[in-house]
């Protein structure tokens, strides 16, 4: 049996047109062992749990091993940035695959694929670009996805770094 666990500890959604934070969540206000009422499970089973330091986080169940998702925050159609602190756990020869997305199910996603040592930008379930990336299973990861619209064109940028280290100035992956 393969067991893989994914946890989210912080979510932030920013509207780039006026730089206001329109959604923040650290899960501290939610009841333990329940799924938050203001979020929606697409697939998989999720619940609020606590880590060793007592901080609450959203945790995905180890099974079933499928592509799982949670939708949260207000609907956004314009330029925005999403930043999430996430941790995936490796078990034996199994690796997690995790990511974040903007603009709904068919929007762009920034996905970390440790089994292939890469980061991908995905649109409509298909990778549109990938770059090499070495995941650290011992650390929480920070993922930031930014979509900018200008003159009917979009620029998608993705950053990934270990929690506690300095965020990269330049994105690790871009697509236009």
Where are these regions (language model features)?
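Extracellular glycan-recognition surfaces and repeat-rich motifs
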Residues: 31-57, 66
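Short, solvent-exposed beta-strand-to-loop segments that form ligand-recognition rims
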Residues: 159-176
């Amino acid at each position: 049996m393969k067991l893989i666990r994914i946890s989210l500890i912080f979510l932030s959604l920013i509207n780039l047109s006026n730089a206001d934070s329109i959604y923040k969540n650290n899960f501290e206000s939610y009841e333990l062992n329940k799924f938050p009422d203001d979020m929606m499970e697409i697939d998989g089973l999720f619940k609020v749990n606590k880590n060793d330091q007592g901080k609450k986080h959203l945790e995905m169940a180890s099974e079933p091993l499928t592509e799982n998702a949670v939708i949260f925050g207000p609907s956004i159609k314009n330029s925005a940035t999403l930043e999430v602190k996430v941790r995936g756990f490796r078990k034996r020869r199994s690796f997690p695959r995790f990511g974040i997305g903007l603009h709904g199910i068919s929007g762009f996603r920034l996905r970390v694929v440790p089994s292939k040592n890469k980061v991908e930008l995905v649109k409509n379930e298909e990778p549109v670009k990938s770059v090499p990336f070495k995941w650290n299973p011992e650390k929480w990861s920070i993922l930031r996805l930014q979509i900018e619209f200008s003159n009917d064109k979009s620029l998608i940028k993705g950053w990934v770094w270990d929690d506690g280290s300095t965020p990269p100035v330049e994105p690790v992956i871009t697509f236009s």
